[in-house]
Every structure is written in C-alpha cells, then in structure tokens.
Regions:
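Bulky hydrophobic segments
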Residues: 1-111, 115, 119-134
C-alpha cells in the first residue's frame, strides 16, 4: 500500500509542476505542438453550460485529475485539510496570474472550471469516507 501511495504522491507532485507550467506559459504549449500555433487552445470537449454560467471543461478535467491524485496521496493523513485549502488557492491564484501574463487572459469560465474540478473530487471523497468503511 505504501508503494501505491508513493506512486500517487509522485504523480501528484509531477502533475502540479506540469499544471503550473501550462498555466504560466504565455500562450498554449499544446497549441504550439498540435497546431503549430501558440494562440490556439485545444478543447478536449465543449465547455459546460450551467444556467447562465460557462464552465471550462478543460479546466474541470485538469483539476479533477490533480485533486484526485492529491486525495489518493494524502487521504487518511493529517495533511488532507491542508491539501484541500492548497487546491482551492491554487485554482484561484493560477487563474489570477493570467491577468499579468502576456498572451493570457483571466476568464471566469476557467476559474469556475478550476473550482468545480476541485469541488467534485472533494465531495466524492467526503461522501466515500463518510459512508464507506475502509
């Protein structure tokens, strides 16, 4: 079990580095490689519409992955509450950095996507630890 948990921790730290790099890069790294155009952002799926709100699907997926790796790494430890705060702050701060990064722009749909990705995994985690005995 420790080897699996260590595997998830390495994945979590690696995913943090990748996500922060992708967020702080002026333009789109994926667009540079896939389309030979750093101004085009590839879409995995269409954005999500909830009432009048648009939620960036790419951002939801990225933060679901990051939060899942974090929860798998730190569940049943004292660090889980710190992890939750860290992920919420990271999701907000990274999007706020887009205000000052060249060729990037702050978008509420991206911010909502980040936060929704974190909330979904945390809700599932809280339900599982409450109703499923491990």
């Amino acid at each position: 079990m420790n080897k699996l948990k260590n595997f998830f921790k390495i994945g979590f730290y690696f995913a943090n580095i990748i996500l922060i790099t992708l967020y702080l890069f002026p333009g789109s790294i994926f667009g540079c490689f896939l389309y030979d155009n750093c101004y085009i952002q590839p879409q995995i799926t269409k954005d999500l519409f909830v009432g009048d709100f648009i939620i960036s699907a790419n951002h939801v997926y990225a933060f679901i992955l990051l939060t899942s790796l974090g929860v798998l790494s730190f569940h049943n430890t004292k660090k889980i509450n710190f992890l939750i705060v860290y992920l919420f702050l990271l999701s907000i701060i990274l999007e706020l950095f887009h205000i000052i990064i060249i060729d990037r722009g702050f978008e509420l749909s991206d911010l909502f996507g980040n936060i929704v990705g974190v909330i979904l995994v945390i809700l599932i985690y809280k339900i599982v630890i409450r109703y499923v005995k491990t």
